[in-house]
Every structure is written in C-alpha cells, then in structure tokens.
C-alpha cells in the first residue's frame, strides 16, 4: 500500500480499535496472538495476553492490518519455537471462500493508463487485478456455510459458529474440548474429506447423512481443506477488521446475513483518487471512477477500493 494511503487508513483502523468489541476466547491466556502490521508482508507472532484490556493496549500501540489468535491452546503460547509451546489441543475450523464456490470475475487494469485489459502484462508491468465479488456470490457461499453447520450438528453432534471473514468468505469454528480438541491432522483430514468427497455406500432419499443428501441433489462442499487439517492455524478475531477489504469479521446469528455497507465501521466521506477507469459494482451499487480524477465517496467504499489496490484515500471527513 502507498505510504500516504497507509497513514489515513491506519488512523481509521486505530480509531476503530479504540472501541471495538473483540470476541475473545475465555482461555485467551492459552492462545497465541499474531498480527500483520501496516507496511509489512510478515506477521508478528508468538504474542500472549492475559486480558482483553492488555490486548487492546497493545494493538492501539501497534495498529494491525490483520489480527489473529490461534485455534490451538498452548502451555506456553509466547514460546518462539512451535515445539516449545506445548500443544494442548485445537478447535475445529472450516474455511469457505468465494473462489471455491462461484465463478469470480477477475478484472485487470493497466497501471500506466488505468484502462481495463485482457492481457497478463502491460508494457512490462503486471496489471492491477481486482476480483469483483457479487452479493449473489457471497450469499451462495453463506448457504454452503449453513449446510456445513447443519451437517456438523446432524452427523457429528458438534455445534459450530459461523463468521463472515471480513472479505469474501466465511469461517466456521467448533470450540473443541477433550477428544475433539485432540484430533490430529489425519483425523481432521478425514473430516474435511467427509464434506468435500462424500461416498455413501447407498444413496436413498429417506436415509440420514450423505446418503439422503446426495439423493436430494446436495453435493460435496468445496472447502479449504488445509485450514481444517492444520492444528496450529491462526484465525481472525471476531470484531477485528480484515485488511484486504476493511470489513468487520462478524458472527452470523439466526441464519440471517446481509452483505452490505454495514459491514464497514467507517463514517463520513472521503476523497478517493482512482488508479483505474471503470464502472465498479460493490454491495449492489455501481460506482464510476476515472484514473487520476479525485471523487468524493462514502468512506466505507473508498477504504474498500483502496485496500483492493484500485486507488488511494487522500482525505476523509466524518
């Protein structure tokens, strides 16, 4: 991200975290915390906090672009080497992304003139790429998340919470104890394959499980299997901001989800300087931008487009 843009968006993120309600586990002292700073491609890891107040104080001094805690519990979560942490068990995770569920349209723009192109190269430079996610696509992914949640309950007796990722997908999390927590990667791989490649011996509509589902036309679900298998996975903290879009990571309750501007916490308007010339669709609204021509736009939209690399936020007014 551009340094000037970073400064403004970092201020917005910092102001958000002053009052943000982060949904933290009751055993947070057993979790490893991590974050990605602004202007850095690497994570700061092996952090440990004993209270929400201690965490908030830290992130106000070190504003995160992305903020995580571990799905695993550890005896020594701040140990620098993974083998020294003392693994005590992990939650069970599922990750759904629009790329795996929908045919996502990827648009390319040449940085020299901002115009859309079909080429993979613009006079020796890579094009600006923007995956345009539709509301229809997000809702399809949400339907798959609900299906996974229901299957976990019906077939395994497990209760999963669903979270919007803050970008273009959903996470499901089963808080595990005892046998569930101690599942090893091979066990978790079998569970992942149960969802992606169901193979019931008999297909009959009246049967429970995948036998009945396949008979009704329900197919296996494309999930990121590595997320489910990994016992040391970092997960986004509910209530944090996803630095790829500036949207909040939120829990979905009562099976209801609306993909819209409310997912961004920012108020007011901003001056947005586009890098591209195009008509862009976001949250079912269309925005026309022209390269190097500043426009006044809703800050929620400006931050989203800036984090997608389509321009920069020059100023904002509450």
Swiss-Prot record:
Its EC number is 2.7.7.-. The keyword DNA repair does not apply. Disulfide bonds: none annotated. One of its GO terms (cellular component) is DNA-directed RNA polymerase complex. Pfam families: PriS_C. It comes from the Archaea. SUPFAM superfamilies: Prim-pol domain (SSF56747). The active site is at residues 95, 97, 224. Its cofactor is Mg(2+); Mn(2+). InterPro entries: DNA_primase_ssu_euk/arc (IPR014052), DNA_primase_ssu_PriS (IPR023639). GO terms for biological process: DNA replication, synthesis of primer. One of its GO terms (molecular function) is DNA-directed RNA polymerase activity. Belongs to the eukaryotic-type primase small subunit family. NCBIfam families: PRK00419.1-3. Catalytic subunit of DNA primase, an RNA polymerase that catalyzes the synthesis of short RNA molecules used as primers for DNA polymerase during DNA replication. The small subunit contains the primase catalytic core and has DNA synthesis activity on its own. Binding to the large subunit stabilizes and modulates the activity, increasing the rate of DNA synthesis while decreasing the length of the DNA fragments, and conferring RNA synthesis capability. The DNA polymerase activity may enable DNA primase to also catalyze primer extension after primer synthesis. May also play a role in DNA repair. Heterodimer of a small subunit (PriS) and a large subunit (PriL). This is DNA primase small subunit PriS. It comes from Sulfurisphaera tokodaii (strain DSM 16993 / JCM 10545 / NBRC 100140 / 7) (Sulfolobus tokodaii). The gene is priS.
